[in-house]
């Protein structure tokens, strides 16, 4: 007589066979073979951002990540994410989906990439948790293209939760080090996607605006023979049998191009600063947007060109990137960025007067500290209602050796900084174009003349008066969006404590 276990097994086997036979949808789901460019099908993949009520009733294919999944009886709800856009998808037992298919969909690991065929359906009630609120996708086929590991180093929902909400409701948030240690995952969040898409909207109009103004884009060396500004804050690298340095700035080469009659130049490239500054706004490597321009009579001609370029960028961001701005503001609320036309320009002595009136004690030739910069930004906002302004005529003592002195006041200089929300984003000046004067100033700063001989020599054969400045891309992005740490706007940040990933 057969045992009870044997009898049970004999009953289960036909049931398994029957269940398999009932899986009428087995060809409609599964794990796809690895894509190795074996074929090029005619299948058209639709962007999630294009899934609107106008497509209701259409059968579409979508490739996306599984953001969340929730099984409920004979159906499973998925949220499919594609960059900063997402849509709800429904897998329900019916003509196109079996119980096994619903179970398969419910067990797909978060962040896996899937190909989904489905019918776009208009919903009666808006889906508030998705960007595509008026439609959902009724799934007919689903295939895993690339599976994610079941345990994620961070949860994306936690990574986009506002800190205030986390504190008030006791819900999880993700700290900065965890984000940066797992940057590839963190960059998938809707906030990160929005930040870096907006950042690309800074570089493009910078290049386009200046090109339309007659500027020439140049590339300058990053490996140089001497500290580019004569300071100690440089990275030393082995260069065959000698030492070389990573450029702190393209400054000297921009000027040499002006001496070579390019007249107006700009460059976009990495800048290296060996500063042991673990602050919210300092990086050891960042992207510099640099401008240099010959002028006719006054360096303010250049100041106005730079300010106009930045204003054009701000206008473009506010016009073209409202979705991204709103996405970032959901997690990091901030007042809209304000600016004036023409740009407000104050002299350094006026700024000192405002600070002194607010109770700050400062000497006439003292540089602005970070707290005083921020205070000045608040005072300017209160008085002029702008987040963007220019500070002109800095003390000569706090500027680099190549800065032109003010002819009316030897303690001042023809130099300027530009500020956003009370923080400096550009430093610039009229450059000394006379070889004798630049030699005197270099000696005054203790710079070895032999190491900048090529630079000084470039002025010996006739040099036009010129000025320029350097902008930090990550800092502009941070301040435009009202963020509080430049690491949020650097894709893979480098600071004194971080060299990976």
From Swiss-Prot:
A Pfam family reported for this protein in Swiss-Prot or TrEMBL: tRNA-synt_2
Binding-site residues for L-aspartate, renumbered to this chain: 229, 273, 427, 431
Residues with the N6-acetyllysine modification: 74, 374
Cellular localisation: Cytoplasm
InterPro entries from the UniProt entry: Aa-tRNA-synt_II, aa-tRNA-synth_II, aa-tRNA-synth_II/BPL/LPL, Asp-tRNA_synthase_2, Asp/Asn-tRNA-synth_IIb, NA-bd_OB-fold, NA-bd_OB_tRNA
Keyword vocabulary terms for this entry: Acetylation, Aminoacyl-tRNA synthetase, ATP-binding, Cytoplasm, Ligase, Nucleotide-binding, Phosphoprotein, Protein biosynthesis
Sites where the protein binds ATP: 273-275, 281-283, 424, 472-475
Enzyme class: ligase
Chief site of localization: cytoplasm
Catalytic activity line of the entry: tRNA(Asp) + L-aspartate + ATP = L-aspartyl-tRNA(Asp) + AMP + diphosphate
Domain of life (superkingdom): Eukaryota
Protein family per UniProt: Belongs to the class-II aminoacyl-tRNA synthetase family. Type 2 subfamily.
Protein purpose: Catalyzes the specific attachment of an amino acid to its cognate tRNA in a 2 step reaction: the amino acid (AA) is first activated by ATP to form AA-AMP and then transferred to the acceptor end of the tRNA.
Protein's UniProt name: Aspartate--tRNA ligase, cytoplasmic
């Amino acid at each position: 007589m057969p045992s009870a276990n044997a009898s049970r097994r004999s009953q289960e086997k036909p049931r398994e066979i029957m269940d398999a036979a009932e899986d009428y949808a087995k060809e409609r789901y599964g794990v796809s073979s690895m894509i190795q460019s074996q074929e090029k099908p005619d299948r058209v993949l639709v962007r999630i951002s294009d899934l609107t009520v106008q497509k209701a009733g259409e059968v579409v294919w979508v490739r996306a990540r599984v953001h969340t999944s929730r099984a409920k009886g004979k159906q499973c709800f998925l949220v499919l994410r594609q960059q900063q856009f997402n849509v709800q998808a429904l897998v329900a037992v019916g003509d196109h989906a079996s119980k096994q298919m619903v179970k398969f969909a419910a067990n797909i690991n978060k962040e896996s990439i899937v190909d989904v065929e489905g019918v776009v359906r208009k919903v009666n009630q808006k889906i508030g948790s998705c960007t595509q609120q008026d439609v959902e996708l009724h799934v007919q086929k689903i295939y895993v293209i690339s599976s994610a590991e079941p345990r994620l180093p961070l949860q994306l929902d936690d990574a986009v939760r506002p800190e205030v909400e986390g504190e008030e409701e006791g819900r999880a948030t993700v700290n900065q080090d965890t984000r940066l240690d797992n940057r590839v995952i963190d960059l998938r969040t809707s906030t990160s996607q929005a930040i870096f898409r907006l950042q690309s909207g800074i570089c493009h109009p910078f290049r386009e605006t200046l090109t339309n103004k007659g500027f020439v884009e140049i590339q300058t060396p990053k490996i140089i023979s001497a500290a580019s500004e004569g300071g100690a804050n440089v990275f030393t690298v082995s260069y065959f049998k000698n030492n070389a340095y990573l450029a702190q700035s393209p400054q000297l080469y921009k000027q040499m191009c002006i001496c070579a009659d390019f007249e107006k130049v700009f460059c976009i490239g990495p800048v290296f600063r060996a500063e042991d500054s673990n602050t919210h706004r300092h990086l050891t490597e960042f992207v510099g947007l640099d401008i240099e321009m010959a002028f006719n009579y006054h360096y303010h001609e250049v100041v106005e060109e730079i300010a106009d370029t930045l204003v054009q960028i701000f206008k473009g961001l506010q016009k073209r990137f409202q979705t991204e701005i709103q996405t970032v503001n959901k997690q990091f609320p901030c007042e809209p960025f304000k600016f004036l036309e023409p740009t407000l320009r104050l002299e350094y002595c006026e700024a000192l007067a405002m600070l002194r009136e607010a109770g700050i004690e400062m000497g006439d030739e003292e540089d602005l500290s970070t707290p005083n910069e921020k205070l000045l930004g608040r005072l300017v906002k209160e008085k002029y209602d702008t987040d963007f302004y220019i500070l002109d005529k800095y003390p000569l003592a706090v500027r680099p050796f190549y800065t032109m002195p003010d002819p009316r006041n030897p303690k001042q200089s023809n130099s300027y900084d530009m500020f956003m929300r009370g923080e400096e984003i550009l430093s610039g000046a009229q450059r000394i174009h006379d070889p004798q004067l630049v030699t005197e100033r270099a000696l005054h700063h203790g710079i070895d003349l032999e190491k900048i001989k090529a630079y000084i020599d470039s002025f010996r054969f006739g040099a036009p008066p010129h000025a320029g400045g350097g902008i930090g891309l990550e800092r502009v992005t941070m301040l435009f969006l009202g963020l509080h740490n430049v690491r949020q706007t650097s894709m893979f940040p480098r600071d004194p404590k971080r060299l990976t990933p």
